[in-house]
A protein has these predicted regions:
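Short, structured surface patches at the beginning of a domain
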Residues: 1-134
Length: 134
C-alpha cells in the first residue's frame, strides 16, 4: 500500500483506576491499527475518571480538529464516555473532520444501533451530508 494513502490512526485508551488495563487496551488498539494497515500518528491514555481531568482525550480531539487523524482506535465506547451526550459530541467531531472510529471489542455499528444514539448520529450525518463515523 502506498505510504501516503495509509490511514493515519490515533490510539486512545482509558480504564479509570487500572493502569495495567489501560496499557493493555492501548497495546490491543495499536496492534489492530497496524493490522488494518494504518500509520499510528499518535496516541494517548487517561487514567482518571470523570470528564475534566482527561488531557489525553483533549489532545486527541485537537489532532482530529487539525486534520491529522483519519481513524481513532478504542477498545469500547465506554473508554470515551458512558454518557450518551458525550458520545454524540465525540461522533459529531469525528464526522465534522472526516475521521472514523474503530472499537476493537465489538462492532461499533452493531453496538450503537442498540441505543437511541445511533439514530441521532445518523440524522446528524444525513442533515449535514457527512459520512458516519464507524
Amino acid at each position: 500500500m502506498d505510504e501516503q494513502k495509509r490511514p493515519r490512526a490515533w490510539v486512545y485508551a482509558r480504564i479509570p483506576g487500572d493502569y495495567d488495563g489501560t496499557m493493555n487496551s492501548y497495546k490491543v488498539c495499536s496492534m489492530q491499527a497496524l493490522h488494518d494497515g494504518c500509520d499510528i500518528v499518535g496516541g494517548s491514555i487517561d487514567e482518571r475518571d470523570g470528564w475534566l481531568l482527561r488531557p489525553g482525550y483533549r489532545d486527541m480531539l485537537r489532532q482530529i480538529k487539525a486534520g491529522k487523524v483519519d481513524r481513532v482506535y478504542i477498545c469500547r465506547m465506554r473508554q470515551v464516555s458512558g454518557k450518551e451526550r458525550h458520545l454524540y459530541s465525540f461522533f459529531k467531531r469525528l464526522m465534522q473532520h472526516g475521521a472514523q472510529v474503530t472499537a476493537t471489542e465489538y462492532s461499533l455499528r452493531d453496538r450503537v444501533n442498540m441505543f437511541r444514539l445511533a439514530r441521532r448520529v445518523e440524522r446528524y450525518a444525513t442533515r449535514k451530508g457527512l459520512q458516519l463515523p464507524w
